[in-house]
C-alpha cells in the first residue's frame, strides 16, 4: 500500500491553497464577502480567543459542518465568498483549506496562524 507522509500532504495543500499575508487578508476582509474559519481545538479558542468575526469549526468537523446540505452548516457560502482558514501555526488550516477545495468550494485561502495574526496587530475577541 502506497501512503503519503504528512509532509507530502502539506506540500500538496500549500501548492493548491494560497497562504495570505496579513495585509492581503485585511484587504479581502474589508473589501469582499469573506468568511473566516478557525479550525483550532475548542481549548485553544477558549484559552486564546478568536479572530474577530471568525466562525469556530474544529479541523475534525469541517467537512461535515460545511457540506451544503448539512443541518449544522453555520454559514451560507456562495461562489463569490472568500473563505479564510486559520489554526495555530498554519498547518491544520492548510489541510482544512485543501479539503474545502476538494469539496468544491472556491476562493479558499490559508490565513496561517493565530499568533501570526495577533503579532501583526489583527483584531481578536474572547471566545463567545
What role is predicted for each listed range?
Residues 1-34, 42-82, 91-128:
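Rhodanese-like catalytic fold shared by cysteine-dependent sulfurtransferases
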Residues 37:
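Active-site flanking residues adjacent to catalytic metal/cofactor-binding acidic residues
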Residues 86:
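Short, surface-exposed ligand- or partner-binding patches at beta-edge/loop junctions that are enriched
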Amino acid at each position: 500500500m502506497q501512503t503519503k507522509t504528512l509532509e507530502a500532504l502539506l506540500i500538496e495543500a500549500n501548492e493548491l491553497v494560497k497562504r495570505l499575508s496579513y495585509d492581503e487578508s485585511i484587504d479581502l476582509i474589508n473589501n469582499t464577502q469573506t468568511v473566516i474559519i478557525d479550525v483550532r481545538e475548542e481549548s485553544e479558542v477558549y484559552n486564546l480567543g478568536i479572530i474577530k468575526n471568525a466562525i469556530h469549526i474544529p479541523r475534525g468537523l469541517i467537512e461535515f459542518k460545511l457540506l451544503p446540505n448539512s443541518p449544522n452548516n453555520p454559514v451560507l457560502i456562495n461562489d463569490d465568498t472568500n473563505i479564510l482558514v486559520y489554526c495555530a501555526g498554519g498547518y491544520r488550516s492548510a489541510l482544512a483549506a485543501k479539503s474545502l477545495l476538494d469539496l468544491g468550494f472556491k476562493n479558499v485561502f490559508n490565513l496561517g496562524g493565530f499568533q501570526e495574526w495577533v503579532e501583526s496587530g489583527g483584531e481578536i475577541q474572547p471566545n463567545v
